A protein has these predicted regions:
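Charge-dense, helix-prone N-terminal extensions
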Residues: 1-190
């Protein structure tokens, strides 16, 4: 099957311009983005692409090589699709920065900080392992993102859930936060 809308986009602004024109009429697009810690060069970064997609009610989905180049697919977000805590925080930041559009706002879930509750099984496991007190000393954003990410697997993949939970407990007991939970600092002070 030939993929549609393989875009030759080099910058965040070019992607935003494409989304402004096509977000209501197209079903998908593919772009080449670089992963990793963004720098101030002219590289089109994955995080930038995700942020622009969120502004228009779109979301990243699968990656695959097309003509020998690894491409990222973006699609309109499906109604009632789950929102990760990371994407919720990105949306809060984009709203505050004035980048969010009405199309993006229409698909937002409840956004209050109190709309998130740590999964009771994740909380119980942290408490049983004597890691809960340490976990509660970490930033609230970290707590929400890590607890959500572990709970995400609970109904989808029991083995992955157990591995993610064990890793969270192990790192928490060491007093270590892990992973890119704040988009390389973008989500800390905005």
């Amino acid at each position: 099957m030939k993929e549609q809308n393989i875009l030759d986009i080099q910058t965040r602004n070019e992607f935003r311009t494409w989304l402004e024109t096509h977000h209501t009429t197209e079903k998908a697009c593919w772009v080449c983005v670089k992963r990793g810690r963004p720098t101030d060069d002219d590289t089109f970064w994955y995080i930038d692409a995700v942020e622009e997609a969120l502004c228009f009610g779109w979301i990243d989905s699968r990656q695959k090589p097309i003509d020998g180049v690894l491409m990222q697919c973006f699609t309109p977000r499906k109604r009632n699709s789950p929102w990760s805590e990371l994407n919720k925080e990105r949306a809060r930041r984009l709203e505050k920065l004035g980048r969010m559009t009405d199309a993006g706002r229409r698909v937002l879930p409840p956004m209050g900080a109190r709309s998130f509750r740590i999964d009771e099984d994740v909380e119980a496991a942290l408490k049983a392992a004597r890691a809960w007190t340490k976990f509660k000393t970490f930033p609230l954003l970290y707590q929400r993102i890590r607890a959500y990410n572990v709970a995400f697997y609970k109904k989808r993949d029991a083995q992955m859930y157990q591995q993610a939970l064990a890793h969270l407990i192990e790192e928490t007991k060491k007093g270590k936060m892990f992973g890119d939970w704040n988009d390389y600092g973008r989500l800390l002070d905005y």
